[in-house]
Design a protein with these regions (language model features):
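Short, acidic/small-residue loops that bind anionic groups at enzyme active sites
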Residues: 93-117, 125-132
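ATP/NTP phosphate-donor binding region
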Residues: 1-73
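ATP/nucleoside-binding phosphotransfer catalytic cores, i.e., glycine-rich phosphate-binding loops
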Residues: 240-313
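N-terminal glycine-rich "phosphate-gripper" loop used for MgATP/nucleotide binding
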Residues: 76-87, 92, 108
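Conserved anion/nucleotide-ligand pocket segment
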Residues: 123-189
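Internal helical hairpin/lid segments
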Residues: 198-260
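A short helix->loop->beta-strand "cap" motif at the edges of active sites that frequently abuts
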Residues: 8, 73, 99-104, 122-124, ...
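Conserved beta-alpha junction segments in alpha/beta enzyme cores
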Residues: 18-29, 177, 181-212
């Protein structure tokens, strides 16, 4: 994977939803940091009801994605925000084109659908990291931006440890060390893609999941759905990310998130694998970047990840 260089062109895409005016603000944000921003048309668009949750029609969003990858002058493809609709274009993506022009692709939440599809059919590492409108324009904590730059710029190589900031309240639900390919993303999207050719396969991998605005019974149901579909068969370790604004649980933050942990234990304890929870990646603040598709080691007792391969060079 080519690393993102200083002053590189970064293309802003909106494969799902968009917010009016956010694309131009994001371009200014990139410009202030010395990059050359390029805004694709759908990132400035929004369909009329009932499809007003989409940033442009499927053909336009797909064309933006293809053009961003095909352009050799583009150093990274960065999603403006999540929302809804990334899954609508999965069948039409030219995965061969993406494979031939692999470059850092950054996003999370609804973009999980693209992460899974790209890893399965294009075969390169993608970055579960902050989005421009959803995170960086919203003023996330400093580790959010720095962790992304460290990951995509090639500063981290094989053997580098990825640690959560000191204020993170990690919880070792099951101790141990495991090595495998990091795979996962937003839990609702992982469950929604069950039974399709884009479904997650965590065999011999380290499973990561996170979510926002979910109730514990729904989290329980989604985990049960994935487990019964065989998605967890052969998984070597589990990394539980941010679960922000758990519905029906008083408060927010790490203390509220701990209400989730007995449920997670129930779903994975029989497997005898390491489980680390409270990792600050996803819809929380900070939102640390993870290299999906990369080989990593999870040390649940130490509360850290180690890269077993370079992810950007």
């Amino acid at each position: 994977m080519p690393a993102l260089r200083a002053g590189a062109r970064i293309t802003i895409v909106a494969p799902a939803s968009a917010i009016a005016g956010a694309a131009d603000e994001a371009a200014e944000w990139l410009l202030e940091r010395g990059y050359e921003p390029q805004v694709m048309p759908a990132a400035r668009a929004r369909l009329a009801p009932p499809f007003d949750y989409l940033a442009g029609d499927d053909a336009a969003r797909l064309a933006d994605l293809h053009a961003a990858f095909a352009d050799p002058a583009v150093g990274a493809v960065w999603c403006l925000q999540g929302g809804f609709g990334s899954w609508r274009v999965l069948d039409q993506i030219d995965y061969g084109l993406l494979r031939r022009h692999a470059k850092p692709f950054i996003g999370y939440s609804d973009v999980t659908a693209l992460h899974l599809a790209i890893q399965r059919y294009a075969g390169f590492v993608t970055f579960h990291g902050p989005m421009l409108a959803q995170d960086l324009l919203a003023g996330r904590q400093a580790p959010t931006e720095q962790a992304l730059l460290d990951m995509v710029s090639g500063r981290l190589g094989a053997g580098s440890w990825i640690a959560a900031p000191p204020q993170a309240r990690l919880a070792t639900l099951a101790s141990g060390v495991a090595t495998g390919r990091l795979i996962g993303g937003n839990l609702a999207l992982l469950a929604a893609l069950t039974g399709t050719r884009y479904a997650i396969d965590a065999r011999d991998g380290i499973l990561f999941f996170e979510d926002v605005n979910e109730a514990l019974p729904r989290v329980d149901r989604m985990l049960a759905q994935l487990r019964r579909a065989g998605a967890f068969d052969g998984v070597r370790g589990v990394l539980v990310g941010s679960f922000t604004r758990l519905l029906g649980v008083p408060g927010d933050g790490e203390a509220a998130q701990a209400a989730l942990y007995p449920l997670v234990r129930e779903h994975f304890q029989a497997r005898g694998i390491p489980v680390l929870a409270g990792w600050p990646s996803g819809h929380g603040d900070p939102n640390l970047t993870l290299p999906l598709g990369a080989r990593v080691t999870l040390d649940a007792g130490r509360g850290a990840l180690r890269l077993e391969q370079p992810v950007a060079v």
